[in-house]
């Protein structure tokens, strides 16, 4: 299903992620002027700054960002402001430990990382609503702010949630969906392995199974509860839909607050494609357009055994999937240097020409806002090995020159803004089968192999391909523009989707289905 996109860029726009709270105030004006000299028009700020805005509960401080906004005004720099809810302050998690996510074994996450919270904690939602509203009240009317980003990388790192609040919310979700325990028992096939429930209190979140504990698999981290366990797959599938709904509700809450205070010409977005999240519904209900993070250099990661047969071209697949959510999407984080936390994701610095190549790759797939990550190389914390455009020495360098030249070249491409992809081939996807492939080893293997093979064939034959997400509300006309549609392995398929596919084939389209289609 395609999303209508209300917000449109009038020109290709370039930005950089900037963290004024991490740098001395004396550097700010010079940094913004150097960015502008390179063609950068926008800075993205605010993510992970909750403790700056609210150092103690109910005590708010806007001094740092007030000064920064005055500096931005002085230099003429535009701003994308990010809500800081991805990293709660220490006072919050210490005072209200019920906001913390847990492993499946019941161990609470602690303070010191990020994304350690659960969407379903009433207290966390309450405190998030307060900080988002205070920031929106303060900066929402400011004409320098062209847009707002909600949180940062929803469902990244943690896309499973096991707190008491999550268990209670899961039961509410199931009661709303099934109404009765008999209906749930039938839908989950609970007669298999004697899993029938007689009271709602017996229904729990996905748990550690004997096969997992014996194999010593994911029981320690408590994440990745899919095909590595012997848990009821129908229960897992509903759980993933529950996580999706919880995340989207969290995003919607923030969007509703922002809409009350920000200017009508300012956009709302969020970034990244991460597990157990229906980006189409989230974008349709809460955002003006979807944004993606693109790090093609991770194809060359030094600490990963994963193979990318087409190397950095692999990111064309992810960009095409982002285009399926928003035809004219944004890039919140475009790789500009070597990447790496101190613990993982170590990847080398882009070779000469690769920043230009990767930027053009994003633009070619429909991105109209490109925000490089980051302006300055980090010199503290977990991201200490994550390089930006500038190195630690603060001098002009090869990457800055390449960014400048790339942006100048993109200025010659303005006629493509608002253009439409004209692929003749599409790959059909849906979230039910995406989630199910995590619960079923056979489905997952088939899906991974076929999806990669179709992508490689498309790339080496220079045949552009779109991704089309099907729902029961999709219209057959959405497929008519494609001569061929691949629907790799839709193990789960509804009668309404069968009718959509039948109409497509009867209209002359070629449909390619994979093994196990419709088996569930």
Report each predicted region and the residues it spans.
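Carbohydrate-binding surfaces of carbohydrate-active enzymes
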Residues: 200-206, 215-219, 223, 264, ...
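Short, acidic/polar
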Residues: 22-37, 128-134, 272-283, 351-359, ...
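Conserved, mostly hydrophobic/aromatic
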Residues: 16, 35, 43, 72, ...
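An acidic-aromatic substrate-binding cleft motif
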Residues: 2-27, 32-42
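Polysaccharide-binding and catalytic clefts of secreted carbohydrate-active enzymes
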Residues: 105-317
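Aromatic-lined substrate-binding rim segments of carbohydrate-active enzymes
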Residues: 29-38, 42-109, 136, 254-262, ...
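The substrate-binding groove and active-site-proximal loops of carbohydrate-active enzymes
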Residues: 13-25, 46-65, 110-129, 154-159, ...
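Short, well-ordered coil/turn segments that N-cap beta-strands
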Residues: 9-14, 39-41, 73-79, 141-146, ...
